[in-house]
Structures are given as C-alpha cells and as structure tokens.
C-alpha cells in the first residue's frame, strides 16, 4: 500500500520528538550530522549491531546503503574496545537482528543472507553469545513484526504468531490492522510505540508498561519503524 511521499519538514519535527521521547526515558542521545549522500542513513539501526562486549558493523543488503557503514564506523569505533565487521558475500541489516538476553535471533530476508547471518553468529560466539536464524516470508525485517521487551514478553504480529521458534515467549499479540505498532522499543520500563494504534497501546499497557506514543508517520512512508531510527546501547 502506497502511503504517499513523506513531508520533509514534518519528518524533521517528528525526529525531534523521537529524540525527546528517548531522553524522557533517561537516555543520553547523540545526534549525528545529516548525511545527504545517503538518504536512508536516518535509519541508523541497520548499519551496526551493538552488544555489551563489541560493536559489529554490518554490510547492508541494499547496495545503496553500504556507504553508511563507514560513516557510523567513524563515529562509533572509538567508543568500543572490540569492533568487528561483516564482509562480502555476507549481507545483513541489523533491523533483522533481535536480542533476547544473550541470544540473538537473525531474520533471513531480502536484505540479510545466510552468509551474513553465519558471520554474525560466529562473531557473537567469540564473545560468549549465541545466535540462530529465522526465515522471513512477508516482512522487510525481523523487527518489523517482533519486539522483545523484557521478562520473556514478546510483542508479536503476523507470520511470527504461530512460529514454534517463538512459542516459549509470553506473547503480546498485535492485530494485523495495527501491525506497524509491532515495531516498538522497550526503554527503562517504558515502551515507545508509534502514535495511532489504540489496540496495541492497550495491550502493552495491560501488561504493566508505561507507553509513550511517538508520531513517525513520515518514516512509515519509507518502510521505517521506531527502532530503525536509533542505535541503542
């Protein structure tokens, strides 16, 4: 479904509100300079995976995005003692990676191939973590339809609901008509969700969380979700 072209000024305003929402949860937010050469670079989550022990720079499946990795590497390399990199022929975007404690689920998608996933798992193993793959059928990225909160609680939608891989979790089921809200962010006992999804909001509140709504309608038009807009560590 085509949602129309994004309104640039509205997107800027929404981005500022997103930053304020993260700050209201107690996070220190580092805002990067705009990178006009790479229009997708606002979706900063995809180009690096940050773990407690290392930073892993990815190799996006969208060739037009590969230059973004160098930009983020320049910013982050000095902040981590251990930095790793995914190499060709592997491709991976971190929107396909969901961390649950010390285990990482990796979606195999149009953007993430098995070579990229295997490289990530090898790196994770080196630092004492584990990883496994999930085949995607419909969504762009794994976290388009899944968000892990804490305490075994998983926000889940669509193709993942009946997947036995996720049967061990306590599900917060998001109805198909509000599937965009399945991409949300848990931050210090708060859950950030996109504005305008009352059923999803109610379900998450009923689980005991404080919900903060953030309008990201202009980023939805670009297939971007809440988690895509930040690297959290």
At which residue positions do the language-model features occur?
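The feature marks the mature, well-folded catalytic cores of soluble enzymes
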Residues: 1-233
């Amino acid at each position: 479904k085509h949602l129309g072209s994004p309104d640039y000024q509205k997107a800027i305003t929404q981005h500022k509100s997103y930053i304020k929402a993260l700050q209201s949860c107690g996070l220190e937010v580092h805002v990067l300079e705009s990178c006009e050469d790479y229009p997708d670079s606002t979706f900063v989550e995809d180009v690096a995976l940050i773990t407690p022990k290392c930073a892993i720079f990815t190799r996006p499946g969208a060739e037009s995005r590969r230059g973004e990795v160098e930009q983020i590497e320049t910013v982050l390399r000095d902040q981590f003692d251990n930095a790793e990199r995914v190499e060709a022929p592997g491709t991976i975007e971190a929107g396909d990676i969901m961390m649950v404690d010390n285990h990482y689920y990796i979606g195999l998608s149009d953007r993430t191939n098995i070579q990229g996933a295997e490289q990530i798992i090898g790196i994770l193993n080196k630092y004492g973590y584990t990883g496994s793959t999930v085949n995607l059928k419909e969504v762009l990225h794994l976290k388009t339809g899944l968000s892990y909160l804490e305490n075994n609680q998983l926000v889940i939608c669509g193709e993942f609901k009946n997947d036995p891989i996720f049967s061990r979790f306590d599900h917060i089921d998001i109805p198909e008509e509000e599937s965009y809200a399945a991409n949300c962010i848990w931050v210090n006992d708060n859950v950030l969700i996109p504005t305008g999804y009352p059923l999803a909001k109610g379900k998450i509140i009923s689980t005991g969380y404080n919900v903060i709504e953030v309008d990201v309608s202009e980023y939805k038009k670009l297939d971007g979700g809440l988690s895509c807009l930040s690297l959290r560590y």
